[in-house]
Amino acid sequence: NGEMEHRRYFDINNYKRLSENEMSESEAKRLLKNCFQKSICRQLKSDVRLGCQLSGGIDSSLITAFAVKAQKASPLDTFSVIINHLDFSEEKYSDLVCEKLQTNQHKFTLSNDEVIQYFEDVIWHLDSMNNHPNAMGFYWLTKNAADYVKVKLSGEGADELMGGYVQ
C-alpha cells in the first residue's frame, strides 16, 4: 500500500527461558542429540551426490559421524583442506575420523602460491574487503570438492550455536 510502519519485529525477551530445574542435563543432552540427528537426516535428502566438509574439529567430526550413520549406503565423501605452513594442523584428527568412520577421504593442500592466485576471487565472492580467516581455505576446499559433490555439509556456524570461541 506504499505506507511505512515502524514496529518491533523480534524481541528475544518474549521467549520463555528454561530454568536449570526444568530439564535435567541428561534430558538436555538427549534432546540436543535428537535435534542434531533429525537435522542431519533432513540435510541428507538430496537428488545429487553430497559429502561432508571435515576439518577434524568437533563440529565437523560430529556432523560427519551422524551423516555416516544416517546414510549407510556407500562410503561418504569427506573433504579437508590442508595448510602446511600453519603452526597447528587438524589433519591428524580428520585422518582419525575418516579411518574410524571409513569415509572416502579427499584432502586438498592449499599452498602460498594458490593463496596469491585466488585472493581476488575470494574477495569477489565475499563481496567485501572484510576477509574472514577461513575464507581462503573454504574457497579452496569448495572449488576442489565441486569435482566430486554438489552439496557439502559443514560445521560452519556451529561455534556460535554450541558456545565455541571461548578465548
Over which residues does each language-model region extend?
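Non-catalytic substrate-recognition/targeting regions of SAM-dependent transferases
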Residues: N1-I12
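ATP-dependent adenylate-handling active sites, centered on carboxylate activation for C-N bond formation
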Residues: N14-Q167
